[in-house]
A protein has these predicted regions:
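Short loop/edge segments at beta-strand edges and connector loops
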Residues: 35, 88, 122-123, 170-172
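Beta1/beta-strand and adjacent pyrophosphate-binding region of the FAD-binding site
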Residues: 1-14, 32
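Helical element adjacent to the flavin cofactor pocket in flavoenzyme catalytic cores
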Residues: 139-193, 197, 201
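Glycine-rich FAD pyrophosphate-binding loop
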Residues: 23-45
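Flavin-dependent oxidoreductases
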Residues: 17, 184-252
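Gly/Ala-rich phosphate-binding loop of Rossmann-like dinucleotide-binding domains
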Residues: 19, 23, 160
Length: 252
């Protein structure tokens, strides 16, 4: 049986980041991370758009706005430190019709309140950034938004975590718990603390520990359409004005 001070469940960006930070704060602690797949980042952390969002979608008094801004700054610095290719192409937010202009103004206000650099553009100015963009009268441009290959980030974090002394056990899935012991597909692990970073299954594990009784994770799958144009055909990311009631959902 394995014993540790802290067990982290889940080898995505969140789990790896937490494990590294715990190791930094408690250098003498034994930190173990388990990942059910054969490598870290095999799910959402390694299969996403790789956009480092600047943080102007969310209400400025929210933790999400704060952490998005700080996360963009810190992850940009991490990529530069690790020499991970970073495309600082920015992002255009475009309006479909007159009904989007009020929301566009609200996004600009949120950006200012949260200390995010944003530029208000006319449709003509937007076309200077991306000639093929279509917008109704106005657009917003976020120069701080960038894109990166998410798997390169995960791989770098995994290498750093292991070098810093975190024990990573791949092909090791969480099965259940018995008091202080966590059962996995290979062995039992006795841990002083358990950190639940299990992604889309985090709610199920949380319920076994007496949490998340009133919450459920509702997964959504994003679909990508590929064109036959060569990479780099567009100069920047182009996003529609989101539904500000829930910015995670983009309107077509």
């Amino acid at each position: 049986m394995t014993t540790c001070d802290v067990l982290v469940i889940g080898g995505g960006v969140i789990g790896l980041s937490i494990a590294r930070e715990l190791r930094r704060r408690r250098p003498n602690a034994r930190i173990v991370l388990i990942e059910k797949e054969s490598s870290c980042g095999a799910h959402a952390s390694g299969r996403n758009s790789g956009v480092l969002h600047a943080g102007f979608y969310y209400s400025p008094d929210s933790l999400k706005a704060k952490f998005t801004r700080l996360g963009c700054e810190q992850l940009t610095a991490y990529c530069e430190q690790k020499q991970i290719p970073l495309n600082k192409c920015g992002k255009l937010v475009v309006a479909k019709d007159a009904g989007d202009l009020k929301s566009l103004d609200e996004l600009f206000r949120r950006g200012q309140a949260n200390g995010i650099e944003l530029q208000e553009l006319t449709d003509i100015e937007a076309k200077k950034i991306e000639p093929r963009v279509k917008t109704y009268q106005r657009a917003l441009f976020s120069p701080r938004t960038a894109t990166v290959n998410p798997l390169l980030v995960v791989n770098a974090m995994q290498d750093d975590a292991q070098r810093e002394g975190v024990q990573i056990l791949v092909d090791t899935a969480y099965v259940g718990k018995n008091d202080r012991r966590v059962r996995t597909t290979h062995d039992s692990i006795e841990a002083g603390y358990v950190v639940n970073a299990a992604g889309l299954y985090a709610d199920k594990i949380a319920m076994e520990y007496g949490f998340s009784e009133k919450y459920r994770i509702l997964p959504f799958k994003g679909l990508y359409l590929y064109s036959n144009e060569p990479p780099g055909s567009f100069r920047t990311n182009i996003y529609p004005v989101p539904d500000l009631r829930n910015p995670a959902f983009l309107r077509a």
